[in-house]
UniProtKB/Swiss-Prot annotation:
Domain Cadherin: 36-134, 139-243, 248-348, 353-451, 456-561, 568-671
Topological domains, Cytoplasmic: 712-798
Designated name of the protein: Protocadherin beta-13
Compartments, as annotated in UniProt: Cell membrane
Gene: PCDHB13
């Protein structure tokens, strides 16, 4: 249906595009003439246009021949199958044209593909279907007995609605011995009888005569009408009335009211008495004149009896008779010219109208119409216009106008136009006619879908359920119908290694995005891809937008203690000299968290201790320090449980167990060797054990650090290959440890070992870091710092 509609629309455009050329050319071509006798029955054959135009029947049907008329009524109809031009109805020449001869009805013939335009006319031929009729069936003629032979007496004429030879041809009078009748012709072509006296009358012999006047037309056979003429023979009256002027010319506006004084005629009679009394009357007035004017018989004032209409009759020739009391009369002629006033508004006849029209086609013909005005002169001149703010224009050819688009339209800016065609004449006052029409604009796919955002950022928390709705994209299309229906799709990723089709999917109808599988922040922190939106137009238009998916970390990893190792083997023992000052660094708990952000921010606290208050843990970095001075009363062995907790919700934690051994004589960085050294065998054995233990711990610690670094680097490499990894960042809370450096120890611990001699027990006497904990030159400040030790070092003491 849509394709068919577009085809019809194109055909109309082609037709109307050539119409102006056809109209201008048609004015110069000789019109084709046809004729038909009036009173011919409707549907009667006039001509075969196919033969007249030299077209075969198939070609005639293909070219869509049409017959149009400038008037509001077309009296002809065209059979599209046969090409026969037929009458619509029975034609009455007298109703169509009155006394106008010839009676011609004009029409136009339009052909399409290619466009042609012919002027044609149909002449309605008069038949003798009306008989002459005398308006006055009886006429009285007063004739003085003193009238000499040859005196003429004009009689009232008969009326015949037919024209040409079917109109009145002559008059005859019944046989008599005194009168004969002559047929006279007026200036307007109408014929009237004139009674001529052949033999003088004698009132004493014959006071009156009765004659029959017959009017004959020229038809075949002729028709006739009769009237009775009564002739009254009068005594002698030798002076006839005379008008002041034999001819009067007056002009009167067609809008003059009934009763308006047209003119006053005046006649005088030199006779006196009864023979000098004059009466005025309309002489030989037609039915139309008798209905339109009246004359005062005493004063000679001619007045209007009904409203004039310039469009029907432009002038009247009125004969006035002034008769005295005797037999004499005088006559004059009054020519009354009707002045046109602007009393008819212009008329608009719509021949073709197209709606809707495509938005991207300039100079598309929207409407074809004709204008006319029954007035004349300036009152009949017409101007045609539309609103100035519309993208349409009018082109004219004769009295035809074409409304067409001035430029390509945009349906998205305006889907319809209300056009008012204003037709105004140039009369005073000006009259106008307005025709309103609504033109709909058909949509063309000239707008691509537009996303509401150029890029979208979606957040998905890791460990999501498959098929989770993670967000939506939206695009709109300013077109309508199928041109505005949007389909969404995933575009191929720029990174060929990104398994996009296994990560997300999109609903083609509404743009909803779904995660196809559970995401792991530690494996993939984020990725980006492009989505496309295409409409259903022809050709289809599309656009695209960028979508970023950020995987939000969930606290799904507990802290992992790197040092001291918690592998269930021999516990790690830290040696602390009893002479250690408060704040002495015992060791440092090192831990990492596989999560990120605040889920990886770690804090440390002393969960359990053999002797509460002796040791404390620095909450920020996990350093274990002495909280006070050691005494001889303190136990030699201590077991500490350090809790490592992240800042996730809910938080996760791990526990590190430390063994601390308090050792005598371990208070100075370097102690002198005893005077009596142990035996060589005992010293060698103890040294070997100590070196092996220290090497094992150091190797295991170094291996753990390297393994952790390798794992982190491997994960970052994998995340970079899948997509850009976006890790949330934020300020580090003051009470948490920054895990920069992948959780490795921030200080390298080095130990020196000394064996005490003389006891013979190979007792381990000295082990401490070479990095001093406090400046040795300021013992006073160290003691002062003990008073604020927990605040300065952030210990968590049990």
């Amino acid at each position: 249906m849509e394709a068919s509609g577009k085809l019809i629309c194109r055909q109309r455009q082609v037709l109307f595009s050539f119409l102006l050329l056809g109209l201008s050319l048609a004015g110069a071509a000789e019109p084709r003439s046809y004729s038909v006798v009036e009173e011919t029955e409707g549907s009667s054959f006039v001509t075969n246009l196919a033969k007249d135009l030299g077209l075969e029947q198939r070609e005639f049907s293909r070219r869509g021949v049409r017959v149009v008329s400038r008037g509001n009524k077309l009296h002809l109809q065209l059979n599209q199958e046969t090409g026969d031009l037929l009458l619509n109805e029975k034609l009455d020449r007298e109703d169509l044209c009155g006394h106008t001869e010839p009676c011609v009805l004009r029409f136009q013939v339009l052909l399409e593909s290619p466009f042609e335009f012919f002027q044609a006319e149909l002449q309605v031929i008069d038949i003798n279907d009306h008989s002459p009729v005398f308006l006055d069936k009886q006429m009285l003629v007063k004739v003085s007995e003193s009238s000499p032979p040859g005196t003429a007496f004009p009689l009232k004429n008969a009326e015949d609605l037919d024209v040409g030879q079917n109109n009145i041809e002559n008059y005859i009078i019944s046989p008599n011995s005194h009168f004969r009748v002559l047929t006279r012709k007026r200036s307007d072509g109408r014929k009237y009888p004139e009674l001529v006296l052949d033999k003088a009358l004698d009132r004493e012999e014959e006071a009156e005569l009765r004659l029959t006047l017959t009017a004959l037309d020229g038809g075949s056979p002729p028709r006739s009408g009769t009237a009775q003429v009564y002739i009254e023979v009068l005594d002698v009256n030798d002076n006839a009335p005379e008008f002041e002027q034999p001819f009067y010319r007056v002009q009167i506006s067609e809008d003059s009211p009934v009763g308006f004084l047209v003119v006053k005629v005046s006649a005088t009679d030199v006779d006196t008495g009864v023979n000098g009394e004059i009466s005025y009357s309309l002489f030989q007035a037609s039915e139309e004149i008798g209905k339109t004017f009246k004359i005062n018989p005493l004063t000679g004032e001619i007045e209007l009896k009904k409203q004039l209409d310039f469009e029907k009759l432009q002038s009247y020739e009125v004969n006035i008779e002034a008769r005295d009391a005797g037999t004499f009369s005088g006559k004059c002629t009054v020519l009354i010219q009707v002045i046109d006033v602007n009393d008819h508004a212009p008329e608009v006849t719509m021949s073709a109208f197209t709606s809707p029209i495509p938005e991207n086609a300039p100079e598309t013909v929207v409407a074809l119409f004709s204008v006319s005005d029954l007035d004349s002169g300036e009152n009949g001149k017409i101007s045609c216009s539309i609103q100035e703010d519309l993208p349409f224009l009018l082109k004219s050819a004769e009295n035809f106008y074409t409304l067409l688009t001035e430029r390509p339209l945009d349906r998205e800016s305006r889907a319809e136009y209300n056009i008012t065609i204003t037709v105004t004449d140039l009369g005073t006052p000006m009259l106008k006619t307005q025709l309103n029409m609504t033109v709909l604009i058909a949509d063309v796919n000239d707008n691509a879908p537009a996303f509401t955002q150029t890029s979208y950022t979606l957040f998905v928390r890791e460990n999501n359920s498959p098929a989770l709705h993670i967000g939506s994209v939206s695009a709109t299309d300013r077109d309508s119908g199928t041109n505005a229906q949007v389909t969404y799709s995933l575009l191929p990723p720029q990174d060929p290694h990104l398994p996009l089709t296994s990560l997300v999917s999109i609903n083609a109808d509404n743009g909803h995005l779904f995660a196809l599988r559970s995401l792991d922040y530690e494996a993939l922190q984020g990725f980006e891809f492009r989505v496309g939106a295409s409409d259903h137009g022809s050709p289809a238009l599309s656009s695209e937008a960028l979508v970023r998916v950020l995987v939000l970390d969930a606290n799904d990893n507990s802290p992992f203690v790197l040092y001291p190792l918690q592998n269930g083997s021999a516990p790690c023992t830290e040696l602390v000299p009893r002479a250690a000052e408060p704040g002495y660094l015992v060791t440092k708990v090192v831990a990492v968290d596989g999560d990120s952000g605040q889920n990886a921010w770690l804090s440390y606290q002393l969960l359990k201790a053999t002797e509460p208050g002796l040791f404390g843990v620095w909450a920020h970095n996990g350093e274990v320090r002495t909280a006070r001075l050691l005494s001889e009363r303190d136990a030699a062995k201590h077991r500490l449980a350090v809790l490592v907790k992240d800042n996730g919700e809910p938080p996760r934690s791990a526990t590190a167990t430390l063994h601390v051994l308090l050792v005598d004589g371990f208070s100075q960085p370097y102690l002198p060797l005893p005077e009596a050294a142990p035996t060589q065998a005992q010293a060698d054995s103890l040294t070997v054990y100590l070196v092996v233990a220290l090497a094992s711990v150091s190797s295991l610690f170094l291996f753990s650090v390297l393994l952790f670094v390798a794992v982190r680097l491997c994960r970052r490499s994998r995340a970079a290959s899948v997509g850009r990894c976006l890790v949330p960042e934020g300020p580090l809370p003051g009470h948490l440890v920054d895990m920069g450096g992948t959780g490795t120890l921030s200080q390298s611990y080095q130990y020196e070992v000394c064996l005490a001699g003389g006891s013979g027990t190979n007792e381990f006497k000295f082990l401490k870091p070479i990095i001093p904990n406090f400046p040795p030159q300021c013992p006073g400040k160290e003691i002062q710092g003990n008073s604020t030790f927990p605040n300065n070092f952030g210990f968590n003491i049990q």
